[in-house]
Amino acid sequence: MVVGRGLLGRRSLAALGAACARRGLGPALLGVFCHTDLRKNLTVDEGTMKVEVLPALTDNYMYLVIDDETKEAAIVDPVQPQKVVDAARKHGVKLTTVLTTHHHWDHAGGNEKLVKLESGLKVYGGDDRIGALTHKITHLSTLQVGSLNVKCLATPCHTSGHICYFVSKPGGSEPPAVFTGDTLFVAGCGKFYEGTADEMCKALLEVLGRLPPDTRVYCGHEYTINNLKFARHVEPGNAAIREKLAWAKEKYSIGEPTVPSTLAEEFTYNPFMRVREKTVQQHAGETDPVTTMRAVRREKDQFKMPRD
């Protein structure tokens, strides 16, 4: 992995991050004070598929997905188009494809400008509300980015047309990746704006949860610390949560992303992936996954974040 440089030195950024953390301020607030330039890029090189993690706005992520064999690339949720164009040029790749997870402005709001900057782009998404859409997709639709396979997974709940993108290299030994937008976060999930607890259960446990355990999870926002604080509240005896939280605080303090996680990891510390576990059900006062999902999401929406 290669980490890009920010505008502050490591010590200065660490001090600022630690100060924010002591006051209970999350990564989004660091973004407000410092802007996106102080959140570092990250290049994840697993083989043929490379993923450039591009911080955007205050806590969003865009992802440049590169096929190293053909030098063709796709961009996931390009809310800051010029930054996308610059990243593609830096890597010397041809941007051909836009993968939009959902229609919210902080994910799809850059589509119209990007198609003006880069002609001939194919814009994929599962919702007619997505700007500049050229290819509407449904559950299990497939497409290619160079030699990479992309499978579209419908995960309605956060929005009714939400799509996650599962990317793999046929015949390759490298782990696959899934770009989850606002359905699955590190240690969390998206709010149920246009769906139900039953739909989120299906999305997390039946659609995403059945992907290979080593699948890299690239989510839409940097919410990891606060998500883990809530997870700790739900399962105070869970050592995996404590360890991941300490790790995430260190990453945050130096401006580095906490993505990707893996699906296997999510099943150890994400309360929304653990709604079948007795410890989570007992905390919620429920006995089945759907009612537990509903109760835990309701509690998370009202949770007062501790300042540690």
From Swiss-Prot:
Q: Where does Zn(2+) 2 bind?
A: D106, H107, D182, H221
Transit peptide feature range = 1-13
Catalysed reactions listed for this entry: an S-(2-hydroxyacyl)glutathione + H2O = a 2-hydroxy carboxylate + glutathione + H(+); (R)-S-lactoylglutathione + H2O = (R)-lactate + glutathione + H(+)
What's a BP term from Gene Ontology annotated to this protein?
A: glutathione metabolic process
Q: Which pathway is this protein assigned to?
A: Secondary metabolite metabolism; methylglyoxal degradation; (R)-lactate from methylglyoxal: step 2/2
UniProt-recorded Gene Ontology molecular function terms: hydroxyacylglutathione hydrolase activity; metal ion binding
Record's subunit section: Monomer.
Q: What is this protein called?
A: Hydroxyacylglutathione hydrolase, mitochondrial
